[in-house]
Curated annotation (Swiss-Prot):
The keyword Magnesium appears for this protein: no
Keywords, comma-separated and alphabetical: Cytoplasm, Ribosome biogenesis
Molecular-function GO term, any one: ribosomal small subunit binding
Gene expressing this chain: rbfA
Summary of the function given for this chain in its UniProt record: One of several proteins that assist in the late maturation steps of the functional core of the 30S ribosomal subunit. Associates with free 30S ribosomal subunits (but not with 30S subunits that are part of 70S ribosomes or polysomes). Required for efficient processing of 16S rRNA. May interact with the 5'-terminal helix region of 16S rRNA.
PROSITE patterns assigned: RBFA
Protein name per the record: Ribosome-binding factor A
SUPFAM superfamilies with a match to the protein in the record: Ribosome-binding factor A, RbfA
A GO term from the CC aspect: cytosol
InterPro entries reported for this sequence: KH_dom-like_a/b (IPR015946), RbfA (IPR000238), RbfA_dom_sf (IPR023799), Ribosome-bd_factorA_CS (IPR020053)
Length: 130
């Protein structure tokens, strides 16, 4: 089993090369029209399987379609990867939508709502005391 340093190096290389493939080689208008970014790569310890989490500026429905398009084109992407990097075996890849950003934004929205409620209650309390 490779050490963590090797996993990090290979993950970094995969992220860099797949980003270049998405930007330059992939002929997909949906992906080109929306800013698609690789947020995280989970690489298995044996370097055989790779989950690629993407974020995009698109709405959730469009992001789902982008992920479907990427998974449809994954054999082409994997083939391009094989030409670009020297590995005994290019890992099997699967694309997933990274929902962490959405969850973080919803938490921030809830915190803002709570803050506004507290401010409104404080104003009402001050008015009642006056």
């Amino acid at each position: 089993m490779p050490n963590n340093y090797r996993l990090e190096k290979v993950s970094s290389l995969l992220k860099k090369e797949i980003t270049l493939i998405l930007q330059n080689d992939l002929e997909n208008d949906l992906i080109r029209d929306h800013f698609v970014n690789i947020s995280k790569i989970d690489l298995s310890g044996d370097l055989q399987h790779c989950k690629i989490y993407i974020t995009s500026t698109a709405q959730e429905k469009v992001r789902t379609e982008i992920v479907e398009n990427l998974n449809t084109a994954k054999s082409s992407i994997r083939h391009s990867l094989g030409k670009r990097i020297e590995m005994r075996r290019v890992p099997e890849i699967i694309f997933k939508d990274d929902v962490v950003l959405d969850k973080g934004l919803s938490v921030l929205k809830l915190l803002d709502e709570l803050k506004n409620k507290n401010q409104n209650h404080n104003v009402e309390d001050k008015d009642a005391k006056s």
